[in-house]
Amino acid sequence: MGIQGFLQKLSGLLLLLCALPWAEGGKVLVFPMEGSHWLSIRDVVRELHARGHQAVVLAPEVTVHIKEEDFFTLQTYPVPYTKEEYRHHLLGHLQNFFETEFSLKLVLQTMAAVNNVSTFYVRSCRGLLHNTALIQSLNSSSFDVVLTDPFFPCGAVLAMYLRVPAVFFLQSMLCELEFEATNSPNPSSYIPRLLTLNSDHMSFLDRVKNMLYPVPWMYLCHVNYGSLARLASDLLQREVSVVEILRHASVWLLRKDFVFHYPRPFMPNMVFIGGINCANRKPLSQEFEAYVNASGEHGIVVFSLGSMVSEIPEKKAMEIAEALGRIPQTLLWRYTGTRPSNLAKNTILVKWLPQNDLLGHPKARAFITHSGSHGIYEGICNGVPMVMMPLFGDQMDNAKRMETRGAGVTLNVLEMTADDLENALKTVINNKSYKENIMRLSSLHKDRPIEPLDLAVFWVEYVMRHKGAPHLRPAAHDLTWYQYHSLDVIGFLLAIVLTVVFIVYKSCAYGCRKCFGGKGRVKKSHKSKTH
């Protein structure tokens, strides 16, 4: 362990020791989201359990990834759909991103897919909030904090109803509602909007696009979150908006870091924990250690399109397999679909792989990823250059940011050929600049006084100890939109200026009439007398 690692461990230990007088074991209600969202919040739950806290994870009976484990109590509630229906609506739309060229049709399909998934979350939330017995049981359990992912903020509604402080754990939200809810400054002049693929240095036309692009997505958010707002209003017996629900958060734990995201202002209750999923790196199992050792001097390439992609269209899978067979490295490909008939000997298909552990191995040469934030951070943490094949959502923006930093190459999964993938892999493996750039990002990312996991746990315990964090809440929440932008002050000052100008103008006009108007009349009367 180097001195930097020792200091990080020491700072984490000191932070823990400082918290010990107050950390007598609290009760944490966890309301996670599905998929990779659960995988990182799960590490926080495990660490809270290790520090003596009792965690209850609340989840629907029908889930894909959330399973009972020994470091938390799983509390489920019935929902009005089957696992097959849920899988179809959660995962089925992904096939479109391999088959449909980018067009208005694809945009509409994407919006429809988001709406379908949101419909399932609304049904799940309704199943919870209308479960009177469960709600009463939770209310009597005296939880100290609710830890939840607000991407679909059912957990935030529950925290409001239980009158328990909430800690939000997230990467981002639809329509970037996290910035509206926290009143973070968000000018479109230099802060790129989600899905625009803009950087923080924009041309005039980029800024026009940046301002207009969010408009249709605001409509989508209004539709998607409107049902939740009505559910919340019924439960709370008063009219509430989604933004008001989100403002209940005491602290926002954001899986962000400025080595990955563009610099921008944030509020004091927004804490960066980017790279939290890199914390638990373990030794490889005998199976994977054997694969890595057999790769020889050429090393390995890790390939995963995430937990949500289970199958790729046959033609595209064969193109990928052909490209992988052309490079000397050993390919470890996480894939659960039909085995491509042209799969080369250097490519090993596995149903699951320890992605972070493999990327941390010295023989890791490249990482083929769909550009999900978890994978990107694991690539940064371990200093492995990337070939990125974004499929949907913020993955496009993630890939753009890494490409602009010279840490990877982006491919269009719809248009790429076997030659394109082969060339991209050879570029990031053989061109030393990619390795140097990703190592520089890795060094910047790791140069911090405390590990993200320790920081996340500290803030959850902080909210428990102090029953919230109202002192971090900016007064901007209490202002109307025109007060926030000082439009009333501007209007008042403008009225004063106009009044002064009007008075000066009238005074000058009156003075001119007095000075010159009388002389004119005298001259006219004198002329009339001479005639």
Swiss-Prot record:
It is a single-pass membrane protein. Belongs to the UDP-glycosyltransferase family. InterPro entries: UDP-glycosyltransferase, UDP_glucos_trans, UDP_glycos_trans_CS. GO terms for molecular function: enzyme binding; glucuronosyltransferase activity. Keywords: Endoplasmic reticulum, Glycoprotein, Glycosyltransferase, Lipid metabolism, Membrane, Signal, Transferase, Transmembrane, Transmembrane helix. The keyword Magnesium does not apply. It comes from the Eukaryota. This is UDP-glucuronosyltransferase 1A3. Pfam families: UDPGT (PF00201). Residues 1-25 form the signal peptide. It is an enzyme of class 2 (transferase). It catalyses: glucuronate acceptor + UDP-alpha-D-glucuronate = acceptor beta-D-glucuronoside + UDP + H(+); 17beta-estradiol + UDP-alpha-D-glucuronate = 17beta-estradiol 3-O-(beta-D-glucuronate) + UDP + H(+); 17beta-estradiol + UDP-alpha-D-glucuronate = 17beta-estradiol 17-O-(beta-D-glucuronate) + UDP + H(+); 17alpha-estradiol + UDP-alpha-D-glucuronate = 17alpha-estradiol 3-O-(beta-D-glucuronate) + UDP + H(+). Glycans are attached at residues 116, 139, 293, 431.
